[in-house]
Amino acid sequence: TPFWNFRKPRKVPLHTTATQILTVEQIDAMTAEEINAVIRESLSYDEYRYQKENGIRITEPYRAEGLHKVLYQCPACGVEHEMASEGTQLFCKACGKRYEMDDLGQLHALEGETEFAHIPDWYEWQRGNVRAQIEAGEYAFEDEVDVYSLPRVWRYIPLGKAKLTHDPEH
């Protein structure tokens, strides 16, 4: 189940491999930066690429629901926070562009160009846009949020609403 849709669990096969990435001798001959680079590389993965390459079909009729939580900027019109999802579709409420998520985890525009068939490419495009906004001193985000406390590990307690502001001054 992807982190953006925990409410509807999926029955998908899970595969993992434990591998030794460095020996004691290799570690002794490396700097901390080199060791960290090897660790970062070994922990890098792409679930969508793995799904496609291994033919893992996810056929649930709700497979795209919640995807708008991570793919929040429309690549067709550039508007942020107007994406929505339902069933197998992701769509922009601002310009109407719609994408269908196939059973191999790829996106296809229902009309016109498919800007990003591979979900991580869309996500990285958004990250690049945010990075450019930060570097230009233009980044800002503001939203009303629900605030909870977790005094015990088994239940959140609602505390109320708050205004979250993230910009160069805050």
Regions found by a protein language model. Give the residues of each.
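A cross-family acyltransferase "interaction/gating" segment
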Residues: 1-29, 33, 37, 58-78, ...
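Short secondary-structure transition/capping segments
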Residues: 38-46, 95-106
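Mid-sequence helix-capping/hinge segment at a functional interface
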Residues: 49-57
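Short Cys/His-rich "knuckle" micro-motifs
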Residues: 82-87, 102-105
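Hydrophobic residues embedded in beta-strands of well-ordered beta-sheets
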Residues: 90, 169-170
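Short linear motifs in intrinsically disordered
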Residues: 62-63, 80-82, 160-165
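Long, charge-rich boundary regions
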Residues: 100-169
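Rieske [2Fe-2S] iron-sulfur-binding subdomain
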Residues: 8, 12-28, 32-46, 63, ...
